[in-house]
From Swiss-Prot:
GO terms for molecular function: ATP binding; ATP hydrolysis activity. Belongs to the IS21/IS1162 putative ATP-binding protein family. SMART domains: AAA. It comes from the Bacteria. GO terms for biological process: DNA replication. Keywords: ATP-binding, Nucleotide-binding, Plasmid, Transposable element. The keyword ATP-binding applies. PANTHER family: ATP-BINDING PROTEIN RV3427C IN INSERTION SEQUENCE-RELATED (PTHR30050:SF4), CHROMOSOMAL REPLICATION INITIATOR PROTEIN DNAA (PTHR30050). This is Putative insertion sequence ATP-binding protein y4pL. ATP binds at G106, P107, S108, G109, V110, G111, K112, S113. Disulfide bonds: none annotated.
Amino acid sequence: MLAHPTLDKLNTMGLTGMAKAFSELISNGESEQLSHAEWLGLLLEREWSWRYDRKLAARLRFAKLRHQAVPEDVDYRSERGLDRALFMKLIGGDWIDAHDNLAICGPSGVGKSWLACALGHKACRDDRSVLYQRVPRLFANLALARGDGRYARLQRTLGHVQLLILDDWGLEPLNEQARHDLLEILEDRYGRRSTIITSQLPVSAWHEIIGNPTYADAILDRLVHNAHRIDLSGESLRRNQRRKS
Protein backbone atom coordinates (compact mmCIF):
# COMPACT_ATOMS: atom_id res chain seq x y z
CA MET A 1 0.00 0.00 0.00
CA LEU A 2 1.20 3.51 -0.80
CA ALA A 3 2.67 5.29 2.24
CA HIS A 4 1.81 8.98 2.59
CA PRO A 5 1.21 11.15 5.68
CA THR A 6 -2.07 12.51 4.29
CA LEU A 7 -3.26 9.00 3.48
CA ASP A 8 -2.48 7.89 7.03
CA LYS A 9 -4.45 10.82 8.45
CA LEU A 10 -7.46 10.13 6.21
CA ASN A 11 -7.54 6.50 7.34
CA THR A 12 -7.11 7.50 10.99
CA MET A 13 -10.08 9.86 10.72
CA GLY A 14 -12.20 7.11 9.16
CA LEU A 15 -12.43 8.86 5.78
CA THR A 16 -12.06 5.60 3.88
CA GLY A 17 -13.60 6.82 0.64
CA MET A 18 -11.31 9.83 0.57
CA ALA A 19 -8.31 7.66 1.39
CA LYS A 20 -8.98 5.31 -1.51
CA ALA A 21 -9.50 8.21 -3.91
CA PHE A 22 -6.36 9.98 -2.66
CA SER A 23 -4.29 6.83 -3.13
CA GLU A 24 -5.54 6.45 -6.70
CA LEU A 25 -5.02 10.12 -7.55
CA ILE A 26 -1.41 10.38 -6.38
CA SER A 27 -0.62 7.15 -8.23
CA ASN A 28 -2.02 8.65 -11.43
CA GLY A 29 0.27 10.98 -13.33
CA GLU A 30 -2.69 12.85 -14.81
CA SER A 31 -3.78 13.96 -11.33
CA GLU A 32 -1.09 16.66 -11.42
CA GLN A 33 -3.20 18.48 -13.99
CA LEU A 34 -6.11 18.85 -11.56
CA SER A 35 -6.71 22.07 -9.67
CA HIS A 36 -6.99 22.10 -5.89
CA ALA A 37 -10.76 22.50 -6.19
CA GLU A 38 -10.97 19.52 -8.55
CA TRP A 39 -8.89 17.42 -6.16
CA LEU A 40 -11.13 18.32 -3.25
CA GLY A 41 -14.27 17.71 -5.31
CA LEU A 42 -13.11 14.23 -6.32
CA LEU A 43 -12.17 13.32 -2.75
CA LEU A 44 -15.52 14.51 -1.38
CA GLU A 45 -17.46 12.71 -4.11
CA ARG A 46 -15.71 9.42 -3.36
CA GLU A 47 -16.25 9.79 0.39
CA TRP A 48 -19.94 10.57 -0.13
CA SER A 49 -20.34 7.58 -2.49
CA TRP A 50 -18.53 5.24 -0.09
CA ARG A 51 -20.75 6.28 2.83
CA TYR A 52 -23.91 6.09 0.74
CA ASP A 53 -23.04 2.58 -0.48
CA ARG A 54 -22.37 1.39 3.07
CA LYS A 55 -25.61 2.88 4.36
CA LEU A 56 -27.59 1.39 1.45
CA ALA A 57 -26.07 -2.05 2.05
CA ALA A 58 -27.06 -1.82 5.73
CA ARG A 59 -30.61 -0.76 4.86
CA LEU A 60 -30.99 -3.64 2.41
CA ARG A 61 -29.70 -6.15 4.96
CA PHE A 62 -32.24 -4.87 7.49
CA ALA A 63 -35.06 -4.85 4.92
CA LYS A 64 -34.66 -8.57 4.08
CA LEU A 65 -36.44 -8.10 0.76
CA ARG A 66 -37.65 -11.37 -0.72
CA HIS A 67 -36.61 -10.49 -4.28
CA GLN A 68 -33.61 -8.64 -5.67
CA ALA A 69 -35.94 -6.37 -7.59
CA VAL A 70 -35.35 -2.81 -8.77
CA PRO A 71 -37.77 -0.39 -10.47
CA GLU A 72 -35.54 -0.17 -13.54
CA ASP A 73 -36.31 -3.85 -14.31
CA VAL A 74 -40.11 -3.60 -14.17
CA ASP A 75 -41.71 -5.07 -17.31
CA TYR A 76 -44.66 -2.91 -18.30
CA ARG A 77 -45.28 -4.94 -21.47
CA SER A 78 -46.62 -8.08 -19.79
CA GLU A 79 -50.39 -8.35 -19.94
CA ARG A 80 -51.13 -8.08 -16.25
CA GLY A 81 -52.77 -4.66 -16.08
CA LEU A 82 -49.94 -2.73 -14.45
CA ASP A 83 -50.59 1.00 -14.81
CA ARG A 84 -47.22 2.43 -15.82
CA ALA A 85 -48.11 6.03 -14.93
CA LEU A 86 -49.27 5.01 -11.46
CA PHE A 87 -46.25 2.83 -10.78
CA MET A 88 -43.83 5.52 -11.95
CA LYS A 89 -45.54 7.90 -9.53
CA LEU A 90 -45.14 5.36 -6.72
CA ILE A 91 -41.45 4.99 -7.56
CA GLY A 92 -41.08 8.71 -6.89
CA GLY A 93 -41.93 8.07 -3.24
CA ASP A 94 -44.17 11.05 -2.49
CA TRP A 95 -46.80 8.64 -1.17
CA ILE A 96 -44.33 7.49 1.49
CA ASP A 97 -43.71 11.09 2.53
CA ALA A 98 -47.51 11.49 2.79
CA HIS A 99 -47.73 8.28 4.91
CA ASP A 100 -50.13 6.65 2.44
CA ASN A 101 -50.46 2.88 2.00
CA LEU A 102 -50.43 0.65 -1.08
CA ALA A 103 -52.47 -2.48 -1.79
CA ILE A 104 -51.23 -4.79 -4.58
CA CYS A 105 -53.78 -7.48 -5.44
CA GLY A 106 -53.92 -10.20 -8.06
CA PRO A 107 -53.67 -13.95 -8.66
CA SER A 108 -50.61 -16.00 -7.77
CA GLY A 109 -47.53 -15.47 -9.90
CA VAL A 110 -48.33 -12.10 -11.48
CA GLY A 111 -45.50 -10.31 -9.68
CA LYS A 112 -47.09 -8.74 -6.61
CA SER A 113 -44.21 -9.52 -4.26
CA TRP A 114 -41.64 -8.56 -6.89
CA LEU A 115 -43.22 -5.13 -7.42
CA ALA A 116 -43.45 -4.57 -3.67
CA CYS A 117 -39.76 -5.42 -3.28
CA ALA A 118 -38.83 -3.12 -6.18
CA LEU A 119 -40.55 -0.25 -4.37
CA GLY A 120 -38.84 -1.32 -1.15
CA HIS A 121 -35.43 -1.27 -2.85
CA LYS A 122 -36.09 2.23 -4.19
CA ALA A 123 -37.12 3.38 -0.72
CA CYS A 124 -33.82 2.05 0.66
CA ARG A 125 -31.97 3.96 -2.05
CA ASP A 126 -33.89 7.07 -0.99
CA ASP A 127 -32.51 6.64 2.56
CA ARG A 128 -35.73 5.26 4.05
CA SER A 129 -35.97 2.34 6.46
CA VAL A 130 -37.78 -0.68 5.01
CA LEU A 131 -38.80 -4.07 6.38
CA TYR A 132 -40.29 -6.99 4.45
CA GLN A 133 -42.48 -9.55 6.25
CA ARG A 134 -44.56 -12.46 5.00
CA VAL A 135 -47.80 -12.21 6.94
CA PRO A 136 -48.06 -15.88 8.02
CA ARG A 137 -44.47 -15.86 9.30
CA LEU A 138 -44.96 -12.47 10.94
CA PHE A 139 -47.80 -13.74 13.11
CA ALA A 140 -45.74 -16.83 14.02
CA ASN A 141 -42.78 -14.61 14.98
CA LEU A 142 -45.02 -12.38 17.09
CA ALA A 143 -46.32 -15.44 18.95
CA LEU A 144 -42.76 -16.58 19.66
CA ALA A 145 -41.71 -13.07 20.68
CA ARG A 146 -44.56 -12.92 23.16
CA GLY A 147 -43.08 -15.95 24.89
CA ASP A 148 -39.41 -14.95 24.94
CA GLY A 149 -39.74 -11.28 25.84
CA ARG A 150 -39.10 -9.77 22.40
CA TYR A 151 -42.72 -8.80 21.70
CA ALA A 152 -42.56 -5.12 22.68
CA ARG A 153 -39.30 -4.58 20.79
CA LEU A 154 -40.63 -6.30 17.65
CA GLN A 155 -43.83 -4.27 17.78
CA ARG A 156 -41.77 -1.07 18.04
CA THR A 157 -39.75 -2.06 14.99
CA LEU A 158 -42.88 -2.84 13.00
CA GLY A 159 -44.45 0.42 14.08
CA HIS A 160 -41.47 2.70 13.42
CA VAL A 161 -40.00 1.45 10.11
CA GLN A 162 -40.78 3.98 7.38
CA LEU A 163 -42.03 1.38 4.87
CA LEU A 164 -43.41 -1.97 6.01
CA ILE A 165 -44.11 -4.60 3.34
CA LEU A 166 -46.71 -7.20 4.38
CA ASP A 167 -46.63 -9.95 1.76
CA ASP A 168 -49.09 -12.82 1.19
CA TRP A 169 -51.92 -11.29 3.20
CA GLY A 170 -55.13 -13.30 3.37
CA LEU A 171 -53.82 -16.82 2.78
CA GLU A 172 -55.78 -17.97 5.83
CA PRO A 173 -58.34 -16.41 8.20
CA LEU A 174 -56.98 -14.51 11.20
CA ASN A 175 -57.38 -15.83 14.71
CA GLU A 176 -58.10 -13.58 17.68
CA GLN A 177 -54.45 -12.97 18.54
CA ALA A 178 -53.49 -12.21 14.94
CA ARG A 179 -56.32 -9.69 14.67
CA HIS A 180 -55.13 -7.97 17.82
CA ASP A 181 -51.49 -7.91 16.70
CA LEU A 182 -52.33 -6.55 13.26
CA LEU A 183 -54.52 -3.80 14.65
CA GLU A 184 -51.77 -2.74 17.07
CA ILE A 185 -49.24 -2.56 14.22
CA LEU A 186 -51.54 -0.54 11.98
CA GLU A 187 -52.60 1.75 14.81
CA ASP A 188 -48.95 2.63 15.44
CA ARG A 189 -48.39 3.27 11.73
CA TYR A 190 -51.57 5.01 10.61
CA GLY A 191 -50.87 8.57 9.49
CA ARG A 192 -47.20 8.22 10.49
CA ARG A 193 -45.71 5.50 8.29
CA SER A 194 -46.51 3.69 5.02
CA THR A 195 -47.43 0.05 4.47
CA ILE A 196 -47.48 -2.09 1.33
CA ILE A 197 -49.74 -5.12 1.49
CA THR A 198 -49.98 -7.80 -1.20
CA SER A 199 -52.79 -10.30 -1.52
CA GLN A 200 -54.31 -12.81 -3.91
CA LEU A 201 -57.70 -11.65 -2.67
CA PRO A 202 -59.42 -8.44 -3.76
CA VAL A 203 -59.82 -5.78 -1.10
CA SER A 204 -63.56 -6.52 -1.03
CA ALA A 205 -62.79 -9.98 0.46
CA TRP A 206 -60.51 -8.78 3.25
CA HIS A 207 -63.32 -8.11 5.70
CA GLU A 208 -64.28 -11.79 5.71
CA ILE A 209 -60.67 -12.95 6.15
CA ILE A 210 -60.27 -10.82 9.28
CA GLY A 211 -63.36 -12.45 10.73
CA ASN A 212 -64.49 -10.30 13.63
CA PRO A 213 -66.58 -7.42 12.20
CA THR A 214 -65.42 -4.89 14.80
CA TYR A 215 -61.76 -5.69 14.24
CA ALA A 216 -62.28 -5.86 10.48
CA ASP A 217 -63.73 -2.35 10.38
CA ALA A 218 -60.90 -0.96 12.51
CA ILE A 219 -58.13 -2.73 10.57
CA LEU A 220 -59.44 -1.87 7.11
CA ASP A 221 -60.08 1.74 8.08
CA ARG A 222 -56.39 2.11 8.96
CA LEU A 223 -55.13 0.06 6.03
CA VAL A 224 -57.35 0.88 3.04
CA HIS A 225 -58.66 4.38 3.81
CA ASN A 226 -55.55 6.12 2.45
CA ALA A 227 -54.28 3.33 0.17
CA HIS A 228 -53.26 3.48 -3.46
CA ARG A 229 -54.37 0.40 -5.39
CA ILE A 230 -52.72 -1.84 -7.98
CA ASP A 231 -55.00 -4.60 -9.26
CA LEU A 232 -53.14 -7.12 -11.42
CA SER A 233 -54.56 -9.86 -13.61
CA GLY A 234 -53.44 -12.43 -16.16
CA GLU A 235 -51.50 -15.69 -16.12
CA SER A 236 -48.70 -16.52 -13.75
CA LEU A 237 -45.39 -15.06 -14.91
CA ARG A 238 -43.57 -17.93 -13.20
CA ARG A 239 -45.63 -20.47 -15.14
CA ASN A 240 -44.91 -18.69 -18.42
CA GLN A 241 -41.18 -18.64 -17.66
CA ARG A 242 -41.22 -22.39 -16.98
CA ARG A 243 -42.94 -22.98 -20.32
CA LYS A 244 -40.28 -20.97 -22.17
CA SER A 245 -37.48 -22.88 -20.44
